[in-house]
Every structure is written in C-alpha cells, then in structure tokens.
Design a protein with these regions (language model features):
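Alpha-helical transmembrane segments within multi-pass membrane transporters and channels
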Residues: 61-109, 116, 250-255, 285-286
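Helix-loop-helix "hairpin" substructures at the membrane interface of multi-pass membrane proteins
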Residues: 144-222, 245-250
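Transmembrane helix-bundle core of multi-pass membrane transporters
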Residues: 94, 99-169, 196, 261, ...
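Membrane-embedded helix boundary and interhelical linker motif in transport proteins
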Residues: 31-85
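Transmembrane alpha-helical segments in multi-pass inner-membrane proteins
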Residues: 20, 68-76, 198-208, 212-278, ...
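Short, non-helical or kinked segments that cap or interrupt transmembrane helices
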Residues: 25-47, 96-101, 172-175, 193, ...
Length: 293
C-alpha cells in the first residue's frame, strides 16, 4: 500500500509541473490562436532566474533559511514580465499573417532565449538543492517521501484552482473567454483586445515560469530543459485538447500516471508509450479529449 501511494504521489508531482507548462500553452492558444514554440524556454527561464536569485541570497551557506522559499516565485514573475514585453513587440505584428510566420518567430525566440540563458548564466547547470533538502522527508508507512515534492503538488493544485477561478469566476475571465470566442465581436463591443492579449500571454508565461521555479530545487536549471519540457507539454495538450484548460489538467494527470507506470515497469520505452497514447487520442479524437473541432 505504501508503494502504491508513493507511485500516486510521483504521478501527481509530474502532473503538477506539466499542468503549469501545458496550461499556460493552452491558455495562450485558446485566446490568441498562437502555438508558442518558445514556451518551453520560458519555463527554463523561470528556472534559471529562480536558481540565480536563491543562489545569490543563499551565498554559499550549507543550509537554507525558510525565508528563501519566498524567492521561488521570482522566476515566474520574470517570465510573466518577459511575456508582457514579447507580446506587443514580436507577436502582435504577426496576428494577421499566416500561421507559418508565427511558428517561425516563436521558434526563433526559442533559439534566442536558449543563447541568452547561456550568455547570462553560462553553460553549466545551476543548483539550489539546499531548498529541496532543507524540508527533509516524511514517513509514509515504512517508506519516506521528500517533503518538497508535496509542496510542488500543492502549488500545482493551487495554481490549477486559481487559474480556473480567474477564467470562470472573474469579470476579466469573462472578457478573456469572449475574446477567445470571437475577437472581432469583442472588439466591436468595446473590449481592448490588445490588453487582453498581452495579459493572456503574460499569464501563460507566468505559469510556465512558475513550473520552472518550483522544479529547480529538485532538478536544477540546465540548458536544453526547455525543449524537453515543450515536447512533453505538446503531448499533454494533444491528449487534452489545445486551447482547453480542463484538457490540459486531464492530459497532465494522464501523462503523469502513464509516465510513472512506464518508469516503474518498462523504463526503456517510457517516452514511446506517451507518444503512442497521444497518437491513439489523435486517431480517435483529432481535437483531443476536450478540444473544440
């Protein structure tokens, strides 16, 4: 029973991080109809900023103080602020162009962000494992489980609930959904579409940055992590449906569960099983489980 609970917690841990990335990706597409290929590197950017901020505050001390955990959202804030700059400067001029232009500019942005992170922080990984170790472990029956992993699960669940409440229970959420349904009609009714777009893009980037920020104490920040995360985020949104927050949540939970089963029983083909699951969903429901045709 202890082993089963550990596997469930590991599934939820991975699902929490994947939802933060895929949820932001789906939000951006749902409102703006842009597939942001640079989204994974915004996740990596959040990880690097948090690792740098906490590392600078830690100052080489062997143990972390509790107040350092308040610096974890720094990467999310930085990613959101970067999104607020990128949307009006790089993306807005392309809304009336063909989708190929949007893919090219976001792919170029992916490469720029990768080189920018290499330039600022160098080619070597950044680690703040002291925050991961400082919380210790909890006893679950005869097993132990890292306490920080539970923090990640709680943050992921809180982010999912907060995003749902923001989109479906606030006035701006109504405007956001109206713009996603019909941008021209929303503009005709007096909605500032440009403001909606920049805020939606910033929120999506904030979520990606938050994913990187909460995972960096456990995994560290390393070049290339954004591309790996982007690929798996696309698996999530393919399963759940691109543009659907509910689909991103369900897809993240499914991917987390299948990945944990794969690591446990057939680690050699773990990723192949995820891609096969995504392919089967595409065959049965091309728009995903919750996607709109």
């Amino acid at each position: 029973m202890d082993t089963v609970l550990i596997h469930v917690l590991n599934s939820l841990l991975y699902a929490s991080v994947m939802f933060l990335i895929a949820g932001g990706l789906s939000l951006i597409y749902g409102v703006m109809r842009i597939v942001n290929l640079a989204h994974g590197n915004l996740y990596a950017f959040g990880a690097y900023v948090t690792a740098w901020a906490v590392g600078a505050a830690l100052g080489g001390a062997p143990q972390a103080s509790l107040w350092l955990y308040a610096l974890l959202p720094a990467g999310a804030v930085a990613a959101g602020a970067l999104g607020a700059v990128l949307e009006p400067t790089l993306l807005r001029p392309l809304y009336r162009r063909a989708e190929e232009y949007q893919l090219l500019i976001t792919f170029g942005l992916l490469l720029i962000l990768e080189d920018l992170m290499r330039l600022i922080w160098g080619p070597y990984p950044l680690s703040i494992s002291a925050l991961y170790e400082a919380l210790g472990s909890l006893a679950i029956g005869e097993s132990i489980y890292p306490t920080y992993n539970l923090v990640v699960i709680v943050v992921g669940a809180a982010a999912a609930a907060g995003l749902w409440a923001f989109v479906y229970r606030t006035q701006f959420g109504v405007v956001l959904r109206a713009t996603s349904q019909n941008m021209r009609m929303a503009a005709a009714l007096g909605v500032n579409v440009n403001r909606v777009y920049v805020e939606a893009f910033s929120i999506g980037c904030f979520m990606a940055g938050l994913g990187g920020a909460i995972v960096v104490p456990q995994q560290g920040a390393v070049l290339g992590m954004g591309v790996d995360a982007l690929i798996l985020a696309f698996v999530v949104v393919v399963i759940g449906g691109l543009g659907s927050l509910e689909g991103a949540l369900v897809g993240a939970v499914l991917v987390g569960a299948v990945r944990e089963l794969g690591i446990t029983f057939f680690p050699e083909i773990e990723l192949a099983v995820l891609y096969l699951m995504a392919a089967l969903v595409l065959l049965i429901r091309p728009a995903g489980l919750f996607g709109r045709v």
